[in-house]
Amino acid sequence: MTKILLVEDNEMNRDMLSRRLARKGFDVAIAVDGREGVDMAQSGEYDLILMDMSLPEIDGWEATRQLRVSQGAERVPIIALTAHAMAGDREKALEAGCDDYDTKPIELPRLLSKIEALIGNHS
């Protein structure tokens, strides 16, 4: 089963997205801030990380930078999630080390196609 780490501080967004992904057959673990996300990503075996970019403790930009130079998570695909779609955000996310970028509100079919493009069909 494909393991996804969802790093999201907003409880409503977190619960909705984790339930929707679980219904699609993904094993979803949750981190509620950037620091917890970095710690979990370094200690766990995840196939993909969904990273909210507006997080407490350390934001998603910095968390992604840290993961890209850390042992254990440096090659795990990361999709940036943001509600603040500003010009240049996609480029900023890619420069920080994200593999793709998606905007909130999340459209599940669009997100699933991005996940599939990064990790292929999950089992």
Summary of predicted features, one role per range:
Residues E8:
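Conserved acidic carboxylate
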Residues D15-R23:
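Charged docking surfaces used in two-component/phosphorelay signaling
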Residues S18, I106-I115:
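C-terminal output helix
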Residues G25-V32, M40:
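Short hydrophobic/Thr-rich beta-strand motif most characteristic of the beta2 strand and flanking loop
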Residues P56, E74, M86:
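The feature encodes the CheY-like receiver
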